[in-house]
């Protein structure tokens, strides 16, 4: 068979014409220095701030410091296998986490990877971790209540959907308990909850997850955990990952509650990173942008206007103080960013007043407009009564001969303190709260011994399930306060069957 030269040349020509050379240019650098979760990279000249870079062992890092010839990178994972001279590549991507309904009921790390041993999360949707907060015109003022189920909060420092309410206090004063109880109270209220555990012991996180699971709250909750054993970059990222997951639901018209437990540890992790990156330290050795660290996080909590679906993110950041000092750097920063604070006091906690809320220093700047009418009416004078009781109590210690008015006020004050006490993990529906606070403020508890108040309330709640359900239903469905006659009939009917202790 003869081979023609023309055929060969035509074949070669067509091959050459169809040849496509795909050149891929990758920006590659080398590790100059590595340690404590920080790497100094040389050669990534076009790297962007906040860009993800990939080390040769597959671990990702986040570009933070862009210097003249080097890039400071925080490593998002184990860094012990990375050595000097290793290759580092740009990815051209910014950090994103998986979002969506598939995350509900799962425990994930700040990168969105499951750590609960229940298999992979089947979602392809992701959102950037660093996102600009919702603009002014996209928001609307807080007008819907978010019930915590805690009498002292719903009556004295009410929280609305879209609000940022700080929970602040020393260690071991019940801060986490308030966050967990609020999550438990959202059962059946069509709210997605996100619990972000930052720098806590693994055993503590496990105990809290079990609490949520036993109460059936894990069915509407996502847990994001960056425990104390994780590298500090993950502790720094964790709150942003949590709020990113929440934004997906908010922009779809849903209501979200997010608890950051706690932001003091996030600030400490960020201080550690900044000092290792050789950024200049400021007050208490924190970097200059520690205010922005928290403001850009908490500003992402919002109530969207109706055109955007009316969704909301309500944030409950937790801050731990040292010896009750709320004038330290991070506490004052976060107090100035949030819409109010719940101040928990060690003295109250150890004297048996739990939740240990200091009514004088706790405030809600926007929640009052979201309180239901019934609660607003019955709890109107409660804060004042409590403040005057605390004042009289300190005077009464010095003298025994008190006039009748003062003695009566002291007795009412003791009962007020008892009514506002509440066991942990037992949130109370708002209609039951209105009933007991009405009974207190209208004097129905004045003839009940102080030691019987808790038992009186428990038995009243049990009794009304079968006998006073009409009254409770009216409060629940209308939000208004039923007539005094209805309250009087219900409370007096119950008091007939209540036996006081001798």
UniProtKB/Swiss-Prot annotation:
Membrane found in the keyword field: yes
Catalytic activity line of the entry: ATP + H2O + 4 H(+)(in) = ADP + phosphate + 5 H(+)(out)
Main location, first listed in the record: membrane
TM helices/strands, residue ranges: none
CDD domains in alphabetical order: ATP-synt_F1_alpha_C, ATP-synt_F1_alpha_N, F1-ATPase_alpha_CD
InterPro entries (UniProt xref): ATP_synth_asu-like_sf (IPR023366), ATP_synth_asu_C (IPR000793), ATP_synth_asu_C_sf (IPR038376), ATP_synth_F1_a_nt-bd_dom (IPR033732), ATP_synth_F1_asu (IPR005294), ATPase_a/bsu_AS (IPR020003), ATPase_F1/V1/A1_a/bsu_N (IPR004100), ATPase_F1/V1/A1_a/bsu_N_sf (IPR036121)
Sites where the protein binds ATP: 169-176
GO CC terms in record: plasma membrane; proton-transporting ATP synthase complex
Residue numbers spanned by region Disordered: 115-134
Assigned EC number: 7.1.2.2
Gene3D superfamilies: 2.40.30.20, ATP synthase alpha/beta chain, C-terminal domain (1.20.150.20), P-loop containing nucleotide triphosphate hydrolases (3.40.50.300)
Keywords from the UniProt entry: ATP synthesis, ATP-binding, Cell membrane, CF(1), Hydrogen ion transport, Ion transport, Membrane, Nucleotide-binding, Translocase, Transport
Residue numbers marked as site, Required for activity: 362
A GO molecular function held by the record: ATP binding
Record bears the keyword NAD: no
PROSITE patterns xref list: ATPASE_ALPHA_BETA
Compartments (UniProt record): Cell membrane
Membrane topology of this protein: Peripheral membrane protein
UniProt similarity note: Belongs to the ATPase alpha/beta chains family.
Stated role: Produces ATP from ADP in the presence of a proton gradient across the membrane. The alpha chain is a regulatory subunit.
Oligomer and partners: F-type ATPases have 2 components, CF(1) - the catalytic core - and CF(0) - the membrane proton channel. CF(1) has five subunits: alpha(3), beta(3), gamma(1), delta(1), epsilon(1). CF(0) has three main subunits: a(1), b(2) and c(9-12). The alpha and beta chains form an alternating ring which encloses part of the gamma chain. CF(1) is attached to CF(0) by a central stalk formed by the gamma and epsilon chains, while a peripheral stalk is formed by the delta and b chains.
HAMAP family membership: ATP_synth_alpha_bact
Record's protein name: ATP synthase subunit alpha
Source organism: Staphylococcus haemolyticus (strain JCSC1435)
Gene giving rise to this polypeptide: atpA
